[in-house]
Amino acid sequence: MTQSLHPAAQKGFSSGAELYQQVRPNYPQEIGVWLQDRLQIDENSTVIDLGSGTGKFLPYLLQTQAKIVAIEPVTEMLQQLQQAHPMVISLQAFSDQLPLDDESIDAIVCAQSFHWFANLKTLKEMHRVLAPSGHLGLVWNQRDIDVDWVKALANEIAPFEGDTPRYHTGQWKQVFEHQGLFKFNGLQNFQLYHHGTVEQVVSKRLLSTSFIAAMSQHEQQRLKAKFEQIVFDFTGLNPQDQIDFPYRTFAYHFQKIST
């Protein structure tokens, strides 16, 4: 979500915003404690939800009673957010051009988004708007590939990734290697299960992946059938049967270094 959006984000999230809102998992309840204890967010805080998407992470921020500013560059995603959370301040902007004053923000949270804008220009902009010793939280839900059928699904998807930025590659970490803007304060991880039908929480969820959502409808339907066949082969479950899709949630805590 830099000034030039990656084509997979622009096309996939524009055309797939409604599906994204419907089928993406929420987050574990422990994340609320993490926000308050680690990022020190409370009712006196002002917080940015950066790359907010359709607002899936907003309920956890709202529980802290902080003042929230949701920032999202993709119009269709922002529209879904505004429908779901009309009372939240929301802005259409890029991660490296935040329309906010210097040192005006106590914490920035990027949930399921930082890999899209992991560049030094964004880090500098975050550093600018954060108050002294302000907090940065990066959160991702990741499919638990220690489970055999989840690993098989991941293997099916992998050839289509191309150069699409992804959390699991770890490339997003490179921006933190040679910078004096943020210090790393720790990583916590949690377990999460997304319960629903195979069609809803597995195959349609996978169709909401950026580079898949950018494909033709014909190709998406072919993949949907393939995903459902993989689940059946491993579990014996049909598309309308109930299933728990296992995730691991990773929460990284950084803190601003005052220069």
Residue spans for each PLM region:
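Class I SAM-dependent methyltransferase SAM/SAH-binding core
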Residues: 48, 54-97
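Conserved class I S-adenosyl-L-methionine
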Residues: 1-42, 56
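A short, conserved alpha-helix within the catalytic core of class I
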Residues: 117-125
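A short beta-strand submotif of the Rossmann-like class I SAM-dependent methyltransferase core
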Residues: 110-111, 119
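Conserved catalytic/acceptor-binding region of the Class I
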Residues: 127-196
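Conserved Class I S-adenosyl-L-methionine
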Residues: 170, 174-259
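Nucleotide donor/acceptor-binding cores
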Residues: 44-45, 103
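A short acidic, Gly/Pro-enriched loop at the edge of an enzyme's catalytic core
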Residues: 96-107
